Amino acid sequence: ASQVGFMWRTMYQIIGKANEIIAAAEDLEDTPSLRATVSEAKCFRAQSYFLLYRTFDRIWLNIQPTPAENVNDPRDFHAASEKEVFDLIYEDLEYAITNLDWVSDEAGRFTQAAARHMKAKAALWLKDWDTTLEQVEEIEKSGHFDLIALNEVFNARDLNHKEALMVQQWS
């Protein structure tokens, strides 16, 4: 039970931080750098909601930040429908796909490829085969990724190889 609670709390903490970043960006000058930051926050939020939905099914959606000023305000949380959850996931990932570069010089950052991969995974969950295929084909056509020899895939010396769309940089 403690691992389940840990996952639930952690995912909603990530979602909360993402909501804060997304909301704060609304008051700033629109720049490519800001759009990239918001895109990464939306990727974290989409990934967290996808993991929560796959694990628990009945989850609540929160897209508003919870600063100290409104922490005690009443909110109407209810179990979101599958459509509501995946509409938000798709919306967040579409924003990221539009605003992120295909690759990053900083290993472990969300990129357009990672956002497309997450959208393909979400589409698989929904049996949305056309969207799945579209996302995977776009990754393949990008020219940034390719298969490598099997004995190199899990070589600890270089996990950030051309087959990896995104590698978390911690263990």
Regions found by a protein language model. Name each.
Residues 6, 54, 59-60, 75, ...:
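Flexible, active-site-adjacent loop/turn segments at secondary-structure boundaries
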Residues 1, 86, 90-97, 109-171:
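An aromatic- and glycine-enriched ligand-binding surface/loop that stacks and positions planar moieties
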Residues 62, 106-110:
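Short, glycine/acidic-rich hinge or "gate" loops at secondary-structure transitions
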Residues 45, 50-52, 63-65, 151, ...:
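Glycine-rich, histidine-containing beta strand-loop boundary motifs that form or position
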Residues 58-83:
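Short coil/linker segments at helix-helix boundaries
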Residues 53-65, 129-136:
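Short, well-structured active-site flanking segments
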Residues 1-56, 80-84, 93-107:
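Conserved, well-structured interaction surfaces
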